[in-house]
Swiss-Prot record:
Residues 1409-1497 form the Ig-like domain. It is found in: Cytoplasm; Cytoplasm, Cytoskeleton, Microtubule organizing center, Centrosome. Residues 220-251, 758-785, 865-967 form a coiled coil. The keyword Coiled coil applies. This is Coiled-coil domain-containing protein 141. It comes from Rattus norvegicus. PROSITE patterns: IG_LIKE. InterPro entries: Ig-like_dom, Ig-like_dom_sf, Ig-like_fold, Ig_I-set, Ig_sub, Ig_sub2, IgLON_domain, Spectrin/alpha-actinin.
């Protein structure tokens, strides 16, 4: 501390004295400083610093206590200071001069003391504030500790209230912390401000004070910062825990609300599920009102639920929620409850509405049922009939059903919908039960219609049963009557037959009774049906008529048999009686000596027998007449041997008549002999008596024969039959009368010879004889007329039965029969019936004419035939009308028969069409099931042939349809319009289906043709790719050996000759492939289909372009002399080209893994023979290419040779494909001949060359396989067409089992060809001889090999695949090197042809003749059999002609020309030398002509032996080919 500044600043100060005050640890030193006239007090030292506040409250308190003591001690010095001031005042008063000084000293000293005291007071105040600050800090720290303890202690709460209390505690702690913190901050601010003010009020140069202030402020700030850090950290934890607790509280509150809402919804849902829909309409209305109230209330709860859901959504959006899953589940639960509640509310509303409709309908139903019940009571009292009552009951029952149907249906619908809540529909069930009970009760009262319907059903069932029995019986009778009646058998057999017919007659009567019962039942049924006409069904009438006809036939046959049997029995009895009487009259003579009684007895007995004989005889005669009459009425062929039977009966009757006359004579003689013994007078008297009696009887008979009224012959059959029976009964009497007259005449003659006077009785006798004669004539006439009249009426009655109106009605209404058999049967019956009617009509007409002519005789004046004549005329008219109608009916039946036949033909056509369509669909389906591997070209062509077969079947079906259409059009006028329309519509429908199917077949065939064409073009493209790839490889390979620019130039020109004409053609094929693929498969699929081949084409073109560039670069490099580098580049290019050549194998379909696995042994052997490596290249090719080329190379044209050729392999040695005829290729292919090498080494070279081709330019799938070519070269190349524009358009010959070479430019497909080439001048002679053996040797070995494999060379597919030939470039020599000895592979059928081979031009998509098997050269031994066979296909089917040496070949005794399907052959059982020569098979159709040729060589029995090595090679090839063929056909 210092005093105020003196005005004399520059005056020095001097410390006069110092005062030290100490209290405890506190100490101050006060110095008295004098400066001029000024005296001041200065705080020289203060311990601790005046602004030191301590580090804690205890320290502060101690400092405050010490400061209080220090201040108290300083206060104690105040009196001394004031005493000193008073002394100064006294001194000043004493020393007036120094008064100012003393005044000044007194003034400064007082101020200094006051300042010192004030400073110390302020320090005390500072320490007091510091103590308060530390107290607040302590309280703040204690609060912090309490809050931390609160946070650290676990808090358990069981309810939201406890959680809310806990949150309040959090809030309180937070609030208290904030309050304490604020208090502390205020205290710290107050203390800091006080220190700053204290520091500012002190001397500014007092560094200790400043340091003390800084130290104190630092302590304050440190403590404050420490506490605030704790508070902030604690506040953070408090906030975090409070947030968590708030979330928990929010969840708890949400759960509480959710539980509340869920409880309400669950309770309401249970109520909705359990509440009934009401038991009455009023109850239902009340429930509907409550439901509407519940709907209003539910809206409030829906709002609460939506609020909960929004809260849940907000909670779920928070990042630090730990119970999201629980909340989500609860939220989902709320959603489910809300959905279920909404569904139940909607269902409840709908169910209540439905229940309301149900109860409304139920009330209406109850009203209707009440009315029905009243009406039923009224009907019971009326007593209606069953039909009327049934109609009423049915109407009431319908009304009951209709009135209750709606209610019951609504109830059932409601119950089915509320089936899961049975309690809700209890009232519905009860109401429905009441309705049903009442309906059942009323239905039990309304049973008349059911009884009526049951009765009708029973009647219908009975009718059906009766009709079924009738039909069965009619069928049995029809079968029996279909046989011819044989009446000429023995009586026992006849009786058996009669018994059968009698049983059949009984059956017919029973059937008639059944039919009558059915008719009665039907009539009764019709009577019950008030709205229907009471008519018999047509079926019943038809059966009744047919049964009547059959019954008449049965009765007729029974009658015939009965009459015949009775006649036979009666004739036998008559014969016995005749013999007995004859024996009596011959043996028994009346003796005179016998008693009269005995004679009389014998006479009476004989007379009785005689009378019985007469009766039996005339009865037999009547039976015979009746039998003859019945036979005459029989149908044609109904009775077996009719004429014979009639003749037999007539003979029997004639015999009986003769016997009766003879017996009459014997009887008369016996009587005369008996009278001889009597006296004359007695005899005379007896004579007179007998004459009188006989005369009387004759007169009586005359009166009988002359009735008063004329006899009308036009009566009915019954009257005529009665009259005839009476007449037959009179015949014995008439015969007896005749016998009496004859006896009188005999006795007259006897008596006249004995002298008896007879004159008186002569006149009488004469009159008697005359009258009797007249009577005899009349009796005969009467008997004849009566017999014919009865017969006439019998025939008339039979005709009446046949042509009665009912029969005509049936004829006018022909039945609708189902089939032609029924119509034909009906037509036969009608024709038979008409023939029978015509026969009876002719018989009746004949009888009527005879009767009328007989009546016109004088003796028949008392017989009238007018009525009979009228009946005859009416019968003739009726018969004519009936016959006309019968003919019309037969015409109708004939039309029906034709209609049925046509309909059946149409049905057969439909069945044929269905069968064709089914088989065609199966064909398509089976083809579609085949995988891509199986759908090769051969399968496709076979499919096309099958489709063509079905197309031919369709054409044949069309021809049949045309015939049926013509038949319909010819007879359409005879059909009814509806039937004709039916047939026409059926044919039109069939024609429509056939046309549609024909279009399908045509489209399918067109699709197959396009597919075939597409495959062929693709195979041609692949073939070109293989050639191009192989050529690129060879050119690249040869270019590496070129050392001069001229050699490379020659090689380049040769390569350009190959590329230039073929690439545009290949691009045309590519375009055709794309076009065909798009046409077949659509735009996108077609592009995908052609993508591979287009990509491969691009790769080939790139390789060609790269090769050309490499050759150009090579020429440039050769000019610069940089050969090794160029060769290295070409080696790389050569490797890439080989890879490109192998690449197409991955696109092929068929693999030969089986061939490789099955044929490893054979492949190893052939590989050893061929000397090839595993990669397919010859071993020597890589080691000594120059050496092989020098031995096997081709000679360049002279204009291309130069002196530098020795430095490079000839460019022509690349074996390029044949080029078009150019100046550089002077020889045409047809002018070239190839001699085939015969050695095994040449064959090995062929095979190794083939392996090199397949290994470097093939598929790359079977490098170790020797014989089978890659699938791309085989399976795809069969059935090629004939026209090709370049080498790449024509297929290459095949390498068959025999090592033959086929010319590719000759005019025919021949397997024996030769090539004349020049040996290069630089080629060694021995090498040339090895490469080109003599022609004769090659021919012999070639033909010998052919002979051994001839049987198989044209059979197996694999052998055809192995067929290869030497491909020679124009102007180049033959080469057997592997790079040139084998040319391109062809299809599996061995049928490759070039453009000039057959002189035919057809398109690739055509169907010109095509050889699937060619002729091959063959050499046979004389006397051996031989077969030349080809297989040709095409459409139309080609005609094949055989030629030998230009002459047409025909079959004779020496040879046979055979043809089966597509195979044609010439077979010579024994070959002779004359058979040798050129054989040509020429196939021709409208699409083209094709020929195949072969040479037959005939050798003697001393032919050249086959060397062992050739035989081994042949066996190896044959075994290999057989194994591969077997594998391919599995």
């Amino acid at each position: 501390m210092s005093c105020k500044e003196s005005p004399h600043v520059g005056v020095s100060t001097t410390t006069v004295s110092s005062v030290a005050v100490q209290a405890g640890d506190s100490k101050i030193v006060i110095a008295v400083v004098k400066c001029g006239k000024w005296v001041r007090l200065q705080l020289a030292e203060a311990q601790p610093n005046l602004l030191e506040i301590g580090s804690s409250q205890d320290e502060t308190r101690k400092l405050l206590h010490d400061h209080e003591l220090l201040l108290a001690k300083l206060k104690a010095l105040e009196d001394r200071v004031w005493g000193l001031l008073q002394e100064a005042d006294r001194t000043a008063e004493a020393n007036k001069e120094q008064s100012e000084v003393y005044d000044a000293m007194a003034q400064t000293l007082g101020e200094a003391w006051a300042t010192l005291v004030s400073m110390l007071e302020r320090r005390r105040e500072l320490l007091g504030l510091t103590s308060e600050f530390f107290q607040s800090a302590l309280e703040f720290a204690i609060k912090i500790d309490q809050a931390e303890d609160f946070l650290q202690n676990p808090h358990e709460f069981e309810s939201a209230e406890a959680l809310q209390s806990l949150l309040l505690l959090h809030d309180r702690h937070a609030k208290e912390l904030l309050e304490r913190s604020l208090v502390l901050l205020n205290k710290s601010q107050q203390l800091t401000d006080f220190i700053e003010k204290f520091k500012c009020d002190g001397s500014p140069v007092n560094s200790e004070l400043i340091q003390g202030a800084q130290s104190s402020c630092l302590k304050i700030d440190s403590l404050l910062e420490l506490l605030q850090d704790r508070r902030r950290q604690l506040d953070k934890h408090l906030q975090q825990q409070r947030q968590e607790l708030s979330q928990v509280l929010q969840l708890c509150l949400w759960d509480q609300q959710e539980s509340q809402v869920s409880c309400w919804f669950q309770k309401t849902i249970r109520d909705l599920q359990e509440q009934s829909l009401g038991s009455s309409l009023s109850d239902n209305k009340e429930l509907i009102r409550k439901h509407e109230d519940l709907t209003i209330k539910a809206k409030e709860w829906d709002l609460a639920m939506e609020k909960l859901k929004s809260q849940a959504l907000g909670i779920l959006l928070s990042k630090d929620l730990t119970e999201k899953e629980h909340l989500q589940l609860s939220n989902q639960k709320l959603n489910r409850l809300q959905e279920e509640f909404g569904r139940l509310m909607v269902d409840r509303k709908a169910w209540l509405t439905m229940a309301h409709d149900f109860f409304t309908s139920a009330n209406e139903a109850f009203d209707v049922l009440g009315k029905v019940e009243d009406y039923l009571k009224l009907l019971k009292s009326e007593g209606l009939s069953l039909p009327a009552l049934a109609a009423k009951h049915e109407e009431l029952h319908r009304e009951i059903k209709d009135s209750t149907a709606a209610a019951l249906q609504k109830g059932r619908t409601l119950i089915s919908q509320v089936d899961s809540c049975r309690a809700q529909v209890t009232g519905i069930h009860e109401t429905m039960g009441r309705i049903q009970k009442r309906v059942d009760r009323l239905s039990q009262q309304c049973t008349a219609h059911q009884e009526f319907a049951l009765k009708k059903q029973q009647l219908a069932t009975s009718v059906d049963d009766y009709l079924r029995k009738v039909e069965m019986s009619v069928q049995e009778m029809r079968l029996v009557l279909a046989t011819t009646l044989d009446v000429g058998s023995s009586p026992s057999e006849s009786e058996k037959i009669l018994n059968k017919y009698l049983e059949l007659d009984i059956q017919a009567k029973e059937t008639a009774h059944a039919l009558e019962a059915a008719a009665k039942i039907t009539t009764e049924k019709n009577e019950l049906e008030l709205n229907e006409v009471a008519l018999l069904p047509f079926k019943v009438k038809r059966l009744e008529e047919e049964l009547s006809t059959l019954s008449r036939s049965v009765s007729y046959r029974s009658q015939v048999l009965q009459t015949y049997i009775a006649f036979r029995k009666s004739s036998e009895e008559v014969e016995e009686q005749l013999q007995s009487l004859k024996e009596f009259y011959l043996t028994e003579s009346p003796w005179e000596d016998e008693d009269d009684a005995v004679v009389t007895c014998q006479s009476n007995s004989a007379e009785r027998k005689w009378q019985l004989f007469l009766k039996k005889s005339f009865l037999t005669q009547d039976l015979s007449l009746e039998f003859l009459n019945l036979i005459s009425m029989a149908k044609e062929n109904e009775i077996l041997n009719v004429k014979k039977e009639m003749h037999i009966v007539e003979n029997v009757m004639e015999k009986q008549t003769n016997g009766r006359e003879e017996l009459s004579r014997l009887r008369m003689a016996w009587h005369l002999k008996a009278m001889e013994g009597k006296p004359v007078k007695e005899r005379w008297e007896t004579f007179k008596e007998k004459l009188k009696k006989t005369t009387h009887n004759v007169k009586l008979l005359h009166e009988v024969l002359m009735p008063v009224s004329a006899l009308d012959l036009g009566g009915n059959l019954q009257s005529m039959s009665d009259l005839r029976r009476r007449w037959i009964a009179m015949q014995p009497q008439l015969q007896q009368l005749h016998e009496d007259v004859q006896q009188i005449m005999k006795e007259w003659e006897v008596l006249s010879g004995q002298g008896v006077p007879l004159k008186e009785k002569a006149e009488q006798l004469k009159d008697l004889i005359h009258l009797h004669q007249r009577q005899r004539e009349r009796i005969q006439e009467y008997e004849e007329i009566l017999y014919k009249t009865v017969q006439f009426h019998q025939v008339k009655e039979e005709l009446t039965h046949l042509i009665k109106p009912r029969e005509l009605e049936l004829l006018a209404q022909p039945m609708e029969l189902e089939g032609s058999k029924e119509v034909l049967m009906q037509l036969g019956r009608s024709q038979g019936r008409r023939a029978h009617v015509d026969h009876l009509h002719r018989l009746a007409l004949s009888l009527g004419v005879d009767i009328i002519s007989s009546v016109q005789r004088p003796n028949c004046s008392n017989i009238s035939a007018k009525s009979l004549q009228q009946q005859l005329e009416a019968l003739e008219l009726d018969s004519r009308d009936w016959s006309a109608k019968a003919k019309e009916y037969e015409q109708v039946l004939a039309c029906s028969l034709e209609y049925c036949t046509t309909r059946e033909e149409i049905n057969e056509l439909k069945e044929s069409f269905k069968d064709i369509k089914k088989k065609f669909n199966n064909l398509k389906f089976n083809y579609s099931k085949k995988n891509e591997k199986s759908r090769n070209l051969k399968t496709l062509q076979y499919q096309i042939q099958q489709v063509e077969t079905y197309a031919d079947k369709i054409q044949a079906l069309r021809k049949k349809m045309e015939k049926v259409n013509k038949k319909i059009s010819d007879s359409v006028l005879s059909y009814p319009s509806n039937k004709a329309n039916t047939l026409v519509e059926a044919m039109e429908d069939l024609k429509k289906h056939v046309d549609d199917f024909d279009k399908v077949v045509t489209d399918y065939k067109m699709n197959l043709d396009l597919t075939e064409h597409l495959q062929e073009v693709i195979e041609e493209c692949n073939f070109w790719y293989e050639d191009a790839s192989a050529t690129v490889v060879r050119v690249g390979k040869y270019s590496m050996e070129c050392q001069t620019r001229e050699a490379v130039d020659i090689l380049h020109r040769q390569f350009q000759k190959f590329v230039t004409p073929s690439v545009p053609q290949q691009e045309e094929r590519i375009q055709e492939v794309v076009s065909l693929a798009q046409r077949l498969y659509g735009l996108e699929e077609g592009q995908k289909y052609a993508e591979k081949i287009v990509t491969r084409h691009k790769e080939i073109l790139e390789s060609i372009t790269e090769l050309c560039g490499s050759l150009v670069e090579l020429k440039e490099k050769l000019m610069q002399g940089d050969v090794p580098k160029v060769n290295s580049n070409l080696e790389d290019f050569h490797g890439n080209s080989i890879d490109l050549l192998k690449e197409p194998g991955r696109d092929e379909q068929t693999t030969f893994s089986e061939e490789r696995s099955e044929g490893q042994a054979q492949g190893a052997d052939v590989s050893a023979i061929n000397g090839t490596r595993e990669d397919g290249l010859p071993v020597g090719l890589r080691q000594s290419f120059d050496k092989e080329d020098s031995a096997q190379g081709l000679t360049l044209p002279e204009d291309t040779l130069s002196g530098e050729d020795s430095e490079c392999i000839s460019s022509d040695d690349i074996s390029l494909p044949p080029l078009p005829v150019t100046p550089e290729s002077p020889l045409a292919p047809s002018d070239m001949e190839v001699e085939e090498p015969a050695s095994s080494s040449a064959l090995a070279l062929h095979i190794s060359g083939y392996r090199m081709r397949t290994g470097t330019g093939g598929l790359g799938k079977a490098p170790e396989s020797v014989l089978p070519p890659p699938t791309a070269f085989t399976d795809g190349y069969h059935n090629k067409k004939d026209t090709f524009t370049s080498h790449f358009e024509r297929p290459y010959p095949q390498f068959k089992a025999e090592p033959l070479l086929t010319s590719r430019g000759s005019g025919e497909m021949s397997t024996k060809l030769h090539v004349n080439v020049k040996c290069p001048a630089r080629m060694p002679r021995e090498v040339h001889d090895k490469a080109l053996p003599p022609s004769s040797q090659a021919q012999e070995i070639s033909l010998g090999t052919q002979e051994k494999v001839h049987a198989d060379s044209n059979v197996t597919k694999t052998q055809d695949r192995l067929h290869a030939a030497l491909d020679v470039s124009p102007g180049l020599s033959s080469q057997s090197d592997t790079s040139r000895s084998h040319q391109r592979q062809v299809g599996p059928q061995g049928d490759r042809k070039n453009s000039s081979a057959e002189k035919s031009v057809v398109s690739l998509a055509g169907q010109a003749p095509h050889f699937s098997r060619l002729l091959s050269n063959v050499t046979v031994t004389e006397g051996s059999p031989v077969t030349l066979e080809v297989e040709v296909t095409g459409f139309p089917e080609p005609t094949l002609t055989w030629f030998k040496k230009g002459q047409k070949l025909c079959a004779d005794g020496h040879l046979q020309v055979l043809h089966k399907d597509t195979k044609h052959s010439v077979f010579i059982p024994k070959v002779c030398e004359a058979d040798a020569g050129l054989y040509v098979a020429q196939a021709q159709n409208s699409s083209g002509t094709l020929s195949s040729k072969a040479i037959l060589h005939v050798t003697g029995n001393h032919g050249p032996p086959i060397t062992r090595i050739n035989w081994i090679v042949l066996c190896i090839i044959y075994v290999s080919v057989s194994v591969i063929y077997w594998l391919l056909t599995q």
